[in-house]
Structures are given as C-alpha cells and as structure tokens.
A protein has these predicted regions:
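Short, flexible loop segments at the rims of nucleotide/cofactor-binding pockets, characterized by
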Residues: 11-13, 57, 83-89
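Short, well-structured N-terminal submotif of metal-dependent ribonuclease cores
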Residues: 1-36
Length: 137
C-alpha cells in the first residue's frame, strides 16, 4: 500500500505519538510505502523550522536536516508536476493531491478539513491517520 501523507500529519508523526506516528512506524518497517514530492519536503522543512517547534526539536536533539535524513531512509521522492487546474483553496493542498496522483498512491492521509471534505481524488481515498491505520489493519 502506497501512502501520501500531508505535511501536518507527517510533522505530527515525526514529533509526537499517536496515529500519525504509528503510520510512520509502518513505513519505517516496510509494511507500507510512503511517497513525498520535493514540494512537500520543502514545505515540511519550512514548517519545522518555525520558532514554535524549536523547543521540541531541542528536547529530542533533532534538527530539520536530521529529520530529513531520517525520512530519506524510508520515503520515495516522486516528481509531481502541478495539477492542471486548482482543486483546493490552498495551493499546499493541491501539492498533496499532485504528489498522490504522480505516485499512484492508494491512500492520501490528511488532517486538513478541505482535503478531507473531498473524500476522494482521482479514485484515491482521502482519510485521517486513524482511518488509514484501520484500513491497513
């Protein structure tokens, strides 16, 4: 099963426990495949460098570069051309959809209300991290 995980779920899984963390564990263990695009990785690095994450990074002795190095071990980076037309209000959400389409993902995992409201994109279900875990068994 190939997943594309949005930046907020990815960040949550990297920094805290819970369903997003469990999904990343499945990817680390090879139970699922995880794909990201360069645009999504860039967004992750931009978000994680924000001052509000400095404390948790310091407490866990991690840097944005170290997190990226950790991800490179179990994430496939795909070339994801932009969508031909906008789907969502937020261009960052369209980047998730473009990545899923390019990767031929089986599931899009997101906590974003706009993405989740779509329910499905080009035949790819859009689900929460908890729902993804249920589907994966």
């Amino acid at each position: 099963v190939l997943l594309v995980i949005d930046t907020n779920v990815l960040l949550s899984g990297l920094l805290w426990r819970g369903p997003p963390h469990a999904l990343l564990g499945k990817a680390r263990d090879g139970a699922v495949d995880l794909a990201l695009s360069a645009v999504l990785i860039e967004e992750l690095l931009e978000v994680i460098a924000r001052p509000k994450f400095a404390d948790i990074l310091a407490r866990t002795s991690r840097t944005p570069k170290r997190i990226l190095d950790e991800l490179r071990v179990f994430v496939d980076v795909v070339a994801a051309p932009p969508l031909p037309r906008p789907i969502c209000r937020d261009p960052d959400d369209d980047a998730v959809l473009a990545c899923a389409l390019a990767a031929r993902a089986d599931l899009i995992v997101s906590g974003d209300d706009d993405l989740r409201a779509l329910g499905m994109f080009e035949g790819i279900p859009i689900v929460s991290a908890a729902e993804a875990l249920i589907r994966l068994g």
